[in-house]
């Protein structure tokens, strides 16, 4: 049963958030890095959900106490309806410019090329992009920026304020612990998956440049 639903876009500290939530909740948190271990099941399941097919979220997310990052964050509204007692955490960068640079330095690299271009994986990536950014082309900075701001406003409009936590990694444990009613752990807040660290993992990224394990 999910206790935390992530609504933040990729490259907004989602790997950091995953680690923090796993510490707080004592259970796994779904993230794009998990999908790489579930390539036979997750891409088809999330693609079917994006197409409007009936989705068994309990089965897809069995064993997880939280779900952040794509693909799950693209379905934050559906998940919030399915799990009404869960809080929704929208992780953010400090500006569109820093987010755009981080994405272009990492997960956008080669996203539209490679042998994954026609696979279920590629179809899943395209589907979650469309759910998040509509018809904005990934190469059109202005269109993506407009869609980026619309996305955040849509989350604020659809998630009740009492359930929504807007989170930046610099905030540390406080906002998460307050929202979950949990004590602050006696350990430093994790800070993971910088652009440099992402590039150290590029050997793990499949052809096509889709987000790899740790793709925050």
Where are these regions (language model features)?
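PAPS-dependent sulfotransferase catalytic core
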Residues: 1-62
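A structural signal for short, well-ordered beta-strand segments and their strand-loop junctions
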Residues: 6-8, 28-32, 68-69, 87-92, ...
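Short, well-ordered alpha-helical microsegments
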Residues: 14-15, 73-77, 96, 172-176
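PAPS-dependent sulfotransferase catalytic domain
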Residues: 25-29, 34-37, 48-61, 74, 76-166, 179-182
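Short, well-ordered alpha-helix to beta-strand connector turns
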Residues: 63-64, 86
């Amino acid at each position: 049963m999910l206790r935390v639903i992530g609504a933040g876009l990729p490259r907004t500290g989602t790997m950091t958030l995953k680690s923090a939530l796993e510490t707080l909740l004592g259970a796994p948190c779904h993230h794009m890095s998990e999908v790489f271990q579930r390539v036979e099941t997750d891409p088809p399941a999330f693609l079917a959900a994006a197409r409007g097919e009936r989705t068994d979220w309990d089965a897809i997310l069995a064993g997880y106490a939280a779900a952040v990052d794509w693909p799950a964050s693209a379905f934050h509204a559906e998940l919030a309806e399915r799990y009404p007692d869960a809080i929704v955490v929208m992780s953010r960068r400090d500006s569109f410019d820093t987010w755009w640079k981080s994405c272009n330095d990492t997960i956008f690299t080669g996203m539209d090329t490679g042998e994954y271009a026609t696979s279920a994986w590629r179809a899943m990536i395209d589907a979650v992009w469309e759910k998040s950014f509509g018809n904005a082309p990934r190469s059109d900075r202005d269109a993506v920026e407009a869609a980026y701001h619309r996305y955040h406003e849509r989350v604020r409009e659809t998630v009740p304020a009492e359930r929504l936590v807007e989170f930046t990694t610099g905030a540390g444990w406080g906002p998460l612990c307050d929202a979950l009613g949990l004590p602050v752990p006696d350990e430093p807040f994790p800070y993971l998956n910088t652009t440099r660290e992402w590039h150290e993992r590029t050997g793990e990224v499949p052809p096509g440049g889709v987000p790899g394990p740790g793709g925050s």
